[in-house]
Amino acid sequence: STGDSAALPALFGVPFSVKDLLNTRDMCTSYGSRSFQHYQPDKDVVAVSRLRAAGAILIGKTTTPEFAAKVLTDSELTGITRNPWDTQRSPGGSSGGACVAAATGVGPLAVSTDGGGSARIPAAACGILGLKVTMGAIPHESWPFHYGNNSSISINCRHIEDLVASFNAMSGAHTLDPWSRRATTKLSLAPSPQGSPNRKKILFIPALGGQPCDQKILTLVQQTVTDLQRAGYQVDQANSDPLASDPGIAMQLMAANLAARV
């Protein structure tokens, strides 16, 4: 015991995991592929280095499909990663391992990546938080950068306080990532609202990307909207789908980046 907690780093002693797509100096980085199962990088990515500097302790790497190329988490190297709530179902992907680790309490923080939903999709499937940060907010310099500037370092946690603290530790400009040169954003938690929550507004988008959704999910989401309204929140429904033009174009561009680098 130091006797002076204020003198300790912000994340002193906090265990964290890292998606096996990001380089770590003391653990192999396979990118989910048997071709790289023994690859040992000689240094951490910037985000991991900053977490260590903040006192956090890396406890392991989490599973990803090969080269993070799909929204399920399985590979010949690590087998099938299963949903912690129902092992007959998938946790989603490609950061399925990160979200399972966070959801099951392996650690309060899981560092992941997100290009087209890789941190957000499994977060939804596992019932935790998933944040894809603005490009450059957290430096992302490591190979395989196969999704171009669509991909970013992301965060998966159970609690918003952990998400804020980890973002602040990893964020900021770094010379290895030119997109981060103007990154100055730090997060803070707003004080708990006093009195009625009706000052809070929520945007509800019933359809996103023109994709079909299971009726059971739609029913549950609509019930959530109703519950929020009864609690006093203002819920505004979007009249248009911001991704309706053609999300397939974005996926084609990401696939082209992948094919050019693998």
Please describe what each predicted stretch is.
Residues 8-11, 52, 102, 196-197:
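Extracellular/periplasmic catalytic domains that process cell-envelope and extracellular macromolecules
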Residues 13, 19, 51, 79, ...:
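Conserved hydrophobic/aromatic pocket- or pore-lining residues that grip, position, or stack substrates
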Residues 1-40, 68-70, 182, 193, ...:
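Short, well-ordered alpha-helical
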Residues 27-31, 60-61, 147-148, 203-206:
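Short beta-strands and strand-loop turn motifs
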Residues 17-19, 112, 132, 205:
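Short beta-strand segments
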Residues 43-170:
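Short glycine/serine-rich loop segments
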Residues 1-6, 169-262:
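Amidase signature
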Residues 20-22, 115-117, 162, 206-210, ...:
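Glycine-rich beta-alpha junction loops
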